[in-house]
Curated annotation (Swiss-Prot):
GO MF assignments: transmembrane transporter activity
Protein name: Solute carrier family 35 member F2
InterPro entries recorded: SLC35_F1/F2/F6, SLC35F_Transporter
Coiled-coil stretches: none
Alphabetic keyword roster: Acetylation, Membrane, Phosphoprotein, Transmembrane, Transmembrane helix, Transport
Name of encoding gene: SLC35F2
Residues where Phosphoserine is found: S5, S25, S371
Family: Belongs to the SLC35F solute transporter family.
Subcellular location: Membrane
Annotated TM spans: 39-59, 73-93, 108-126, 136-156, 165-185, 195-215, 227-247, 263-283, 291-311, 314-334
Biological classification of the source: Eukaryota, Metazoa, Chordata, Craniata, Vertebrata
Membrane topology field: Multi-pass membrane protein
Species assigned in the record: Homo sapiens
GO CC annotations on file: membrane
Organism superkingdom: Eukaryota
Amino acid sequence: MEADSPAGPGAPEPLAEGAAAEFSSLLRRIKGKLFTWNILKTIALGQMLSLCICGTAITSQYLAERYKVNTPMLQSFINYCLLFLIYTVMLAFRSGSDNLLVILKRKWWKYILLGLADVEANYVIVRAYQYTTLTSVQLLDCFGIPVLMALSWFILHARYRVIHFIAVAVCLLGVGTMVGADILAGREDNSGSDVLIGDILVLLGASLYAISNVCEEYIVKKLSRQEFLGMVGLFGTIISGIQLLIVEYKDIASIHWDWKIALLFVAFALCMFCLYSFMPLVIKVTSATSVNLGILTADLYSLFVGLFLFGYKFSGLYILSFTVIMVGFILYCSTPTRTAEPAESSVPPVTSIGIDNLGLKLEENLQETHSAVL
């Protein structure tokens, strides 16, 4: 009888156990990296914003389909009025450099441009639906994400890693899956009256949203949330009010008001007000780019609600799309970006705090630096 080899017949067992241990260790590392408290908090905050957007979309569609009310500028005007009554008035009662009059004296023209970008971004996207298709709006609206990343690179000095570009690509793949599901479900019935004009409006709106979001991130992290909301409320009310009188006065006059229509307007205004109030808080602890990736799921929430309210057809691709978008969002949040200081800057360096997921810490350190200088 031949003797067994020194390793014996059980030789593969240690190898198998070692491979299993390595795989288990890899899973633990992945879990520890992707499912931290900061990432879970970011996901929850992003989906809260998505639900606010879903609320605005559902109420607008209900007004349009059930009551033939198409007044996007009036709806935005009500939101800006709420921002004015809360945050602009708050600035008026502040003292020192945070006072409303002091801010207007130093930066009035900048906030006029910001208010114009914000108002028109909301308006042109809604108007685009009259000219182009749902597919075009959903796909071209994603154009704002690379524009936002480019603006963040040059204005906020954000520096991205390869994983961030992969994550964005994954999110856009999820949007493509959602669009495919819409086509298969028969939601692509309207071919639009002038597709080219509609597509241009979508690209313009996406770019204006990107500009507004970058300005919002800068103001929220460098100045204050109240200043951003107060100034947007002030100039947004003025600009949207003027535009309202020019483009929608006939539509408003033709509305047959009742308590149901009024309730839908109130619901829209509350959802939009919550969106504007909470988005700066989320951007403060993350970034404008990560927020825009997180709210890509808003259309899916609207679709799920539409299954019951508007009789949409369900497709398993919607679930797949939601999963893909969330995977991309988690990937993006798993690795922090960094902030590169400009070559010449009079501001004390804060490169060690230049991380998206540490927005709150950034403000604390800036305040400490300011106190030390004083």
